[in-house]
Amino acid sequence: INTVLPFGNTLSIVKVTGAELLEALEASTYCTPTSIGGFPQVSGIEFTVDTTKAYDQGEQYPGSTYYGPKSIQRVTIETVGGEPFDANATYTIATNDFMAAGGDTYYAFAAASVNYDLGLSMDEVVMDYITDELKGTVTEEAYGQPAGRITVDQGLAFTDVAATSPYYDGIEWA
């Protein structure tokens, strides 16, 4: 557990509008498909990142090396909690204290209407979940495949390949 949660973070709750959630996801996926440490790890939400569109970089977040989005171009949220996304709704997000304070690309969370650090160690919360909810077992069958919460649309990076090309069969298969 400490290998995947090495920073000693605590569990926080933030309440954000749909628009703030959308900003946070747009900012945290600004360089997708290139990876960064701040890429969102989500549950209870389904969204798409369209990497064929450029990130519309706005102002630099205060005290950060990251820039907020000037406009939302790449991210579309389909559902939150199994319900259609509403930019005007208020959503309750469980996250860590670093992100709740606006760390990495999550500056939108710092201004949340409710921002409360529960003081519970993230590694202990995850251990309790594995022990109590999963009865101590994490299986490949249950957790070994992507859950489909995040779709990354990369478009096609190449033009059509001629049927006479030696690569045609492999590309057609892919």
What label would you give each PLM region?
Residues G155-A174:
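N-terminal propeptides
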Residues I1-G155:
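Catalytic centers of hydrolytic enzymes
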